[in-house]
Every structure is written in C-alpha cells, then in structure tokens.
Swiss-Prot record:
Name of the protein in its database record: Probable tetraspanin tspB
Organism field: Dictyostelium discoideum (Social amoeba)
Entry keyword annotation includes Repeat: no
Cytoplasmic side: 1-23, 90-93, 222-235
Side of membrane Extracellular, spans: 45-68, 115-200
Keywords associated with the record: Glycoprotein, Membrane, Transmembrane, Transmembrane helix
C-alpha cells in the first residue's frame, strides 16, 4: 500500500489558505448563480399559464420551473456555505470542516443534476417542443395566453409558416403588427444558447468545488494527526 503521509503538507496553512481562496472564488460564482437563477425564474414566470394550458411535456415543465429554480437555490447555498467554509478553515475547526465537506458533496450532486438537465434540454431541442405546444394553444380556445406571451417577448406568431390567427399578434391602433420578429427566433436566442452556458458553467463550478473538497479533506486529515485537546473544536 502506498504511504500518503508525506503527500499532505506538514503545516495546515498550506491547506487552509488555498481552501479559503477557492471558497472565495465559489462565493463570487454563487452570486452569479443567484443572479442567473433570479433572471431565469422571473423570465419563465411569464410562461406559467402557457405551461398549464398546453399540457406541456416534462422537458418543458423542467425548463420553465425546475432548471431556473435549481440554479437559484444552489447559488444561495453556495453563498452561505462558502462563508462558513472560510470560517471553519481559518479556525481549523474539525467538526465544522467535516460538516462543510458533507454539504459540499450534496451540493455537488445537485449541481451535476442541474447541469445535466440543462444540457439534456439543449440536446433535446426544447425550442421545437415549445413550438409544438405553441401551435396547439394558438389554435385552441385559450389562445389569449399566446397573445400575452407575444406582448412579453415582442414577437408575432411562432414562425413564418404558422397559421395566422387574426386574434393573435399584437397590433397598434391602425391594425398594423407591432413586431416583426417571429417568436421561435426570439425564444431560441434567449433559451438555447443559455442552456448550454448553464450546463458548461455547472461543470466548471463543479470542478472548483471538487478541488475545495479535496483541500478540506486533506486539512481534516492533517488536523486529526496534530496533537490537540478534545474541546478545541467547540471553543
């Protein structure tokens, strides 16, 4: 068996300083996730009625509710947990470091889940699924939901080949359509590329988080090997 004793620095400082530095980076990234999640929740709240009326697929429901809420919650936990991580690392609190590492593992799993969901939605071409639901609702009795979305997105009809329902497409006082862009192009520009960015960001943040966990584990091992009183962690 390989002896790993000499692989861990003898001085905890060389472990806790990088741990604090990486936690600071994660704190900033946590704020970014909070902002992205808040924007996503606000944006997709306008799709709530559309999702209900269209009897949307699971992928569409995940896009409008699960993904943005997941990003927001993970961001909030990052902001809180990284502050705690900096404190317990600086004070070399053994119990705190163990709890911190366990919580980071849970968040890492959640982050992988959200990132994987975002990439899956991107690869499954969720915009096409939105288009199918859009056409169904446009030709149904509750097409006023589509008119609200058109006003919000500032677009007219789903695409150039979709049916031209006279009740849809916002018009001015002269009956002229207010917007020239089709809704598929607007939604595609706002969703498709951003889903890929969320997935890529989740992978990047996950790597940094994994490094933090390694430093925390090494620091735990070093603290356990150092002579100390049992009451040290509770001071």
């Amino acid at each position: 068996m390989v002896d790993t004793t000499n692989l861990i620095p003898n001085t905890p400082r060389y472990l806790k300083v990088p741990l604090i530095a990486f936690n600071t980076i994660l704190w900033v990234l946590g704020l970014v996730l909070v902002i992205i999640g808040s924007i996503g929740v606000s944006f997709f709240s306008n799709f709530k009625d559309f999702t209900k009326v269209s009897k949307a697929s699971a992928a569409l429901s995940n896009l409008t509710t699960g993904a943005p809420a997941g990003v927001l919650v993970i961001g909030i936990f990052f902001v809180i947990l990284t502050v705690i991580g900096c404190f317990v690392a600086g004070k070399e609190k053994l119990v705190g470091l163990v709890i911190y590492t366990m919580l980071m593992l849970i968040i890492l799993v959640a982050l992988i889940g959200v990132g994987g969901k975002a990439l899956t939605l991107h690869n499954d071409d969720v915009v096409k699924q939105i288009g199918n639901a859009w056409e169904d609702v446009s030709n149904g009795p509750k097409n006023s939901t589509i008119l609200k979305l058109e006003n919000f997105l500032k677009c007219c009809y789903w695409n150039s080949t979709s049916s031209r329902n006279p009740l849809l497409c916002p018009k001015d006082s002269k009956g002229i359509p207010k917007y020239t862009d089709t809704c598929d192009s607007v939604i595609s520009s706002k969703i498709s590329s951003n889903l890929y960015l969320v997935g890529a960001a989740a992978v990047s943040i996950g790597v940094i988080e994994f490094i933090c966990m390694l430093f925390a584990l090494f620091l735990i091992i070093r603290i356990c090997r150092a002579p100390r009183t049992k009451s040290y962690d509770y001071q």
